[in-house]
Amino acid sequence: MIGAKEVNGNLISMRTDWKDFPDIFIAHSANTITSHEKYAAAKAGDMEPALELVNDYLDDDFLNELDKFIKKFDDVHVLPVHAEEMAGRNKIPVAYAQAIQQILGLSLDDDIVQATRAFRTQSDGIGRLVKRVSFEGDVVAGRNYLIVDDVVTQGGTLADLKGYIELNGGKVVAASTLSGKANSAKMAITKSTLGQLRKQAGKELEQWWKEQFGYDFSKLTESEARYINKQIHRDGIDAVRDKLIAARLEASS
């Protein structure tokens, strides 16, 4: 399997072009799911609480919207992010994938798993940027995938999974999460955000980024790029560059 490269002894996922990738389908954006009474148990690896939690946050309007989009493609397989958290293996993405699969009559794929532990849930914005995720498992060439996770913040995990699948011959038609803020829904970086980032960051930082992660700024998510832009505007390019380099060294150690 391809889709990853080794940097300083660490395996990191590559990414693919966004093209016309749609916004993330977010089931619940009103508030966080962390206040749900079953959240801690589900996040720590208990499947029954995870299924109960997912059921409480799904509604017909969202499911109809997702179903309408997915029907544009043949034989779509739902693939959850298998994420390792500090407290255990998070079961919410798997429970969400099972619910989507059963309700929409799709196929479930669990052959691809996270090969590295990123623990992004506990990270700040800079930490999320530099903690890359790699995957392993069989991708079926030509297969259409709907990738799902419990929550989206910057979208890095979903972007990494998309890259792994597509570099191995699959096609990711959409991504969906159970929870997330509405302004996190846009995955594909916009021309205006990319232009602003390149103007503020300069060629040297983008070259460093490419050397570290194997792709340039055009393959960042919209939320990742917006975050870097805000940090540069607030603290200046020198401070942000130093923070990124320090966080990258810590993540690689």
What are these regions (language model features)?
Residues 36-58, 117, 121:
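Acidic/glycine-enriched edge-of-secondary-structure segments
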